A protein has these predicted regions:
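N-terminal signal peptide c-region/cleavage motif recognized by signal peptidases
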Residues: 3-5
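N-terminal small/polar-rich segments of proteins
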Residues: 8-84, 119-160
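Generic structural motif
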Residues: 24-27, 86-92, 109-113
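Acidic, negatively charged sequence tracts
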Residues: 77-98
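Extended, solvent-exposed segments with strong compositional bias
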Residues: 96-126
């Protein structure tokens, strides 16, 4: 037989914190091929061209982003009477340290690009920073009717 006398007490704490990282996105500039003449052939907008697309992603420093850039392979006429299309190809590059400078960008090398947000050079320990995604590419203008041709570029961002 055991005898136990005295006082016993215990304290348990269960603390749970849910921290949701935030990501803010903004189209700084749309990709724009402008007006082109039928049968012009290939028209390129290169990295650094004034008409390239620029997309900004603001996030917490050290946050990892998975960025996917998808697009249709052709531009379509907005007119219902015109079935013509324009072949369309794009490329993408990014900076991940809060500076909008295409000369310091890294080209996308895979379908899903893994990007780690770093602090800007002027304040490397800043809580927030930005990545810039640059969209550029080419269209091939054949013998097509005059019209407005459009297409979509979809940028998907998953943050971890």
């Amino acid at each position: 037989m055991f005898a136990f006398s005295g006082t016993a007490s215990a304290q348990f704490l269960n603390i749970q914190l849910d921290v949701e990282p935030e990501v803010d996105t903004m189209i700084e500039q749309s990709l724009n091929f402008g007006q082109v003449v039928s049968n012009t052939g290939e028209v390129n907008i290169g990295l650094g061209d004034t008409n390239m697309g620029i997309f900004r992603v603001s996030a917490l420093r050290s946050q990892k982003l998975l960025i996917t850039v998808e697009h249709s392979n052709e531009l379509r006429s907005v007119s219902n009477s015109n079935n013509a299309t324009i072949p369309f190809d794009i490329e993408a590059a990014y900076t991940n340290f809060g500076v909008n400078d295409y000369r310091q960008s890294t080209p996308f090398t895979s379908v899903i690009e893994e990007v780690l947000i770093e602090g800007p050079p002027i304040n490397p320990t800043a809580t927030w920073s930005s990545a810039y995604v640059y969209i550029y590419g080419s269209i091939d203008i054949g013998n097509i009717p005059s019209d407005i041709y459009t297409g979509e570029v979809q940028i998907t961002i998953v943050y971890e």
